[in-house]
Swiss-Prot record:
GO annotation, cellular component aspect: cytoplasm; DASH complex; mitotic spindle polar microtubule; mitotic spindle pole body
The gene coding this protein: DAM1
Main location: nucleus
UniProt function note: Component of the DASH complex that connects microtubules with kinetochores and couples microtubule depolymerisation to chromosome movement; it is involved in retrieving kinetochores to the spindle poles before their re-orientation on the spindle in early mitosis and allows microtubule depolymerization to pull chromosomes apart and resist detachment during anaphase.
Organism listed in the record: Candida glabrata (strain ATCC 2001 / BCRC 20586 / JCM 3761 / NBRC 0622 / NRRL Y-65 / CBS 138)
Biased composition (Low complexity): 20-32
GO molecular function: identical protein binding; microtubule plus-end binding
Name used for this protein in its record: DASH complex subunit DAM1
The keyword Cytoplasm appears for this protein: yes
Polar residues compositional bias, start-end: 203-212, 282-295
Biased composition annotated in UniProt, kind: Basic and acidic residues: 1-11, 138-153, 178-197
Ranges in a coiled coil: 113-142
Keywords, alphabetical: Cell cycle, Cell division, Centromere, Chromosome, Chromosome partition, Coiled coil, Cytoplasm, Cytoskeleton, Kinetochore, Microtubule, Mitosis, Nucleus
Length: 307
């Protein structure tokens, strides 16, 4: 269509607008017929004025009308092209709209995003609610199952503990000779002078060397008016028994260690004395160190009996 318009534009020339002036003088108006009566000079002047002023303006007007005609033709051509462009652009927009409805764009903002988000939250809450309900039901059913199992397992008249202790073999708290001797070497006993002075009066040696004396027992009982003498002597006898047992075990260990060593022969020229070694020798040195000479008003030969 546009090519046809261009061809027509190239073939067709601009329209020429001519004045409607006939060459027949008889067809003129009466006013112009009356002009024949004027002088020839006046006619010449009028013709000159028309030629100089009116005819150029009329020519300009005709040229302008021709230019206007050509411009209007081009404007019509432009309008036709714009119509075609609008049709093609409208079809393009329609195709894009159809494509957008058919194809899903995940990152494109839509008005349904908020509703979709709310629906997802509602689904998550409903799933969590169902899980909590199932857990509650399981917790409610567990105690009933436990009670039924306990009733089935319990025999008549016997109550068994729920949590039974495993069969674990406990270590024996037995003291060996080596461990006991090591403990005595690392932790030597601490003795008090006053208690040693009181305990020396109740040792086995004192019981042998000093027989029972009723007067000393009365003095001893009168001196300890605050405490019961029987209970104190009983406690001291228990302590002596423990000490003697420890000393005997340490002696046995020393004998094992000192096998093969020849002991010097004890001369019998002097008085009778106890032959001790190891722990008993330490006890003898301690008893000699804590002698009774430092205690005032004490009779060594008269001691209370050992109980």
């Amino acid at each position: 269509m546009s090519q046809d318009i261009r061809k027509e534009d190239g073939v067709r020339s601009a329209t020429e607008y001519k004045l409607s002036m006939s060459s027949n003088p008889g067809s003129r108006r009466s006013s112009m017929a009356d002009a024949e009566s004027f002088n020839d000079d006046n006619m010449v002047l009028k013709n000159d004025v028309l030629r100089e002023y009116l005819l150029p303006q009329i020519k300009d007007l005709t040229d302008s009308v021709v230019t206007l005609d050509s411009n209007m033709t081009r404007l019509n051509f432009i309008h036709d092209n714009l119509v075609d462009l609008n049709e093609s652009f409208g079809s393009l927009l329609y195709g894009l709209m159809c494509n957008s409805w058919c194809v899903e764009f995940p990152n494109a903002p839509t008005r349904f995003d908020k509703e979709i988000r709310l629906m997802n939250e509602i689904e998550e809450l409903s799933a969590e609610k169902s899980k909590l309900k199932s857990r509650l039901n399981s917790l409610r059913e567990k105690p009933n199952a436990q009670t039924s199992d306990e009733k089935m397992k319990k025999p008549s008249g016997i109550s068994q503990p729920i949590f039974q202790k495993p069969n674990v073999r406990r270590p024996r708290n037995a003291l060996n000779d080596e461990n006991l001797h090591k403990f005595n070497r690392e932790n030597p006993p601490v003795y008090d002078d006053k208690r040693e002075a009181d305990e020396d009066t109740n040792s086995e040696a004192s019981f042998v060397s000093n027989p029972a004396n009723s007067k000393d027992m009365q003095l001893f009982a009168n001196g300890s008016s605050n405490n019961d003498p029987k209970s104190r002597l009983r406690r001291k006898s228990i302590l002596h028994t423990i000490r003697n047992s420890i000393a005997s075990t340490s002696d046995a260990y020393d004998r094992k260690k000192q096998q093969g060593i020849q002991m010097g022969r004890v001369s019998l020229g002097g008085g009778a004395a106890r032959v001790v070694s190891g722990r008993n020798m330490f006890e003898q040195q301690r008893t000699t160190r804590h002698s009774t000479t430092g205690i005032p008003n004490r009779v060594v030969k008269k001691r209370p009996p050992f109980k």
